[in-house]
Amino acid sequence: MTKIMHIADLHFGREDERLVEALAEKEQELRPDVVVASGDLTTFGRRREFAAARELFDRFDAPVVASPGNHDVPYANMFSRLVSPWRRFRRRMGDTITGSYADDDVAIESLETSRGAQWRLDWSLGKARPDQAREIAGRLESNSPQGQLKVVVCHHPLVAPGGMTGRAKTRFGEEAADIFIRGGAHLVLTGHMHQVFALSERHGDHVCWFVSASTAFSIRTRDEPAGFNLLTAEEDHFVMDIYVANEEGGFKQYERRHLTRKEAEIVPEHPGEPGI
């Protein structure tokens, strides 16, 4: 039974300090096997913002698998943004994070969907590389023993509730999603939208869930409060516990969903009063 703590869009530099502390406490309390961070650890890609992210992750007992987001490129240094957009991310985070992880029960790989620059006006939107997606799917398929959970983490959504429009307009996102579905991935964990959702796609008898988390603790909330997801893998389903920020500066479980691994459906369960 694997437990994954899924966080996204931390946006250090625009963080609620009370929620930073609360998240560290929740990691200790919930004791996940691994923490997955779906990008945007920082707001402007500044060194002090990366230092704050590293300080938080150093407090976690669980290993952290992270993929960079569009806010993790140097905002003010155009040369670095164009030539080496992720050098600061990798150098400043160091061995605090990893791009892949595997144990007897789960294998996790990261897909880079953020770009330092693009041939379109909105550089914040995502772009997946189908060739990288095929490489990742191949590694997961060839290196994963029977029964091992296969997980992909990236920043931008590959599928979205309203379709691939607006902020969800990830180039080649649907192609990458199809590659992962056919390659046997069980979970694709994303961020960027500051929105919680779980959508399923299937290939034959195989079901893949695309799960998005809200912003973990940024003051840059949109239509939903800050929060995170805890995903627990059971034999025939995933238990998705959604935590949201409350007025006291902590996190409270808001909803539990059962994501079936044999049929593409969600069975909701409300454990108590909302924490918002």
Predicted regions and their residues:
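Beta-strand-turn-beta hairpins that frame and shape the catalytic cleft
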Residues: 1-5, 100-110, 141, 145-149, ...
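N-terminal active-site segment of His-dependent metallophosphoesterases
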Residues: 1-59, 75-76
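Active-site neighborhood of phospho(di)ester-bond hydrolases with catalytic His/Asp-centered motifs
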Residues: 6-8, 35-40, 64-70, 112, ...
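Active-site environment of divalent metal-dependent phosphoester hydrolases
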Residues: 13-15, 43-48, 70-78, 115-121, ...
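Charged helix-capping and loop-helix junction motifs
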Residues: 20-21, 49-53, 129-130, 166-175
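Extended active-site neighborhood of metal-dependent phosphoesterases/phosphodiesterases
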Residues: 51-135, 179-181, 206, 230
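Conserved beta-sheet core of the metallophosphoesterase superfamily
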Residues: 162-236
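A short C-terminal boundary segment appended to hydrolase-like catalytic domains
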Residues: 233-276
